[in-house]
Design a protein with these regions (language model features):
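N-terminal Rossmann-like NAD(P)+-binding domain of SDR-like oxidoreductases, especially those catalyzing
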Residues: 1-173
Length: 173
């Protein structure tokens, strides 16, 4: 019969083995996949670009030109690690040309108005960036069978502030 400490050690060992297997599965899944990331120069987009690059994915990013030296995209030196195109996802013709030529099998869509205070100052522009950019991606990709997945990533700012410290659930307002 196992003692408490032996059982705990055994569980930790099993979890480490499962974690290692999962990491291998994820790395193998993304290796050599052609992946398009919109919003690649933003905080989340830069991290995603970095990790997919380390997994040997073929990554192309779309984003705004970073204008600050403390920008994560610049700090990670991603311009030398992934392909990058600087344009707005509202520019449907450029987006279509890129998708048609690069032929991504997976698209991570992160492009959005990143600054909340700017969204209050420029609500129409924010809606155009967030909604029309997403519509362009979805509309264009319905024509291409090589696109297998589109993952739209947002933030907690899509939820009404409920002043809770518990975080949000999918069915929150």
């Amino acid at each position: 019969m196992y003692g408490y400490n032996e059982r705990e050690t055994n569980i930790k060992q099993i979890m480490e083995e499962k974690k290692s297997k999962m990491e291998k599965l994820v790395k193998n899944f993304y290796r050599n996949k052609r992946i398009l990331i919109t919003g690649a120069t933003g905080f989340k987009g830069a991290w995603l670009s970095y990790w997919l690059h380390t997994m040997k994915a073929d990554v192309i990013g779309i984003g705004r030109k970073p204008n600050k030296n403390d920008n994560l995209f610049k700090q990670l030196n991603l311009k030398k690690k992934i392909k990058i195109k600087y344009f707005d996802v509202r520019e449907k013709n450029k987006l279509e040309k890129l998708i048609k030529n690069f032929k991504p099998s997976i698209i991570f869509h992160l492009a959005a108005q990143p600054i909340i205070s700017d969204s209050y100052k420029k609500p129409n522009e924010t809606i155009m960036i967030n909604a029309v950019g997403t519509l362009n991606i979805l509309d264009l990709c319905k024509n291409y069978k090589f696109v297998k997945s589109i993952i739209c990533i947002t933030s907690d700012k899509c939820y009404q502030n409920n002043f809770s410290t518990k975080g949000f659930k999918e069915d929150d307002k």
